[in-house]
A protein has these predicted regions:
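N-terminal Sec-pathway targeting helices
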Residues: 1-21
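Alpha-helix initiation/capping motif
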Residues: 2, 69, 82, 140-142, ...
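Context-gated lysine
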Residues: 2-6, 39, 48, 59, ...
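Residue-identity detector for threonine
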Residues: 5, 40, 68, 72, ...
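N-terminal export/targeting and maturation segments
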Residues: 21-95
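Extracytoplasmic electrostatic interaction patches
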Residues: 91-170
């Protein structure tokens, strides 16, 4: 009888593993992000994404790439704008040295983040609702263009990256 119970438990364990392992593989291999491309800020403002994310774009913005994360409601947005229309430095706060490591770990293609790693300056930006964003900005070979990457930050991430006197903790 003990052998039967032991054999039954082993069989049940094997059957459970056969069922749950493929389920776990499917669950973790599924991309939990969505990518959208917009040519202009107006195109973004008229999209379904606008209701969830902020309008941070200067009027001359173009080539807008938006990656949204389903699970965390986070976002990464990359765009370019005319240098004459860039976001004023008075709205950006210099970031701590940990910012490059954070930027390196972003879940976006290396080809999109490498120029920001190589040439970008990092800042914190706070939208009108005090939502914190990591901003990387660089100037391209074209002297009239500036490139931006905005990434939403959770409060604990902002505390580790942004100057402490700029972060609201509520």
């Amino acid at each position: 009888m003990k052998k039967f119970i032991k054999l039954s438990l082993i069989s049940l364990g094997i059957i459970s593993a056969i069922i749950f392992i493929p389920f776990l593989i499917l669950m973790f291999s599924y991309d939990q992000h969505a990518d959208d491309y917009y040519k202009t800020p107006d195109e973004f403002l008229n999209s379904k994404s606008f209701s969830w994310y902020i309008d941070i774009f200067p009027k001359s913005s173009r080539n807008i790439f938006l990656r949204t994360f389903v699970e965390t409601n986070g976002m990464i947005v990359i765009f370019e704008a005319n240098k004459a229309d860039e976001i004023p430095l008075s709205q950006l706060y210099p970031i701590t040295s940990k910012g490059i490591d954070y930027l390196s770990d972003f879940n976006i293609p290396a080809s999109q983040k490498q120029p920001f790693l190589d040439n970008g300056k990092l800042y914190c930006y706070f939208y009108s609702n005090n939502s914190p964003y990591l901003v990387s900005k660089y100037y391209s070979n074209n002297p009239d263009l500036v490139h931006y990457m905005f990434t939403s930050l959770r409060s604990e991430e902002a505390l580790g990256l942004c100057p402490s006197n700029t972060v609201k903790t509520h």
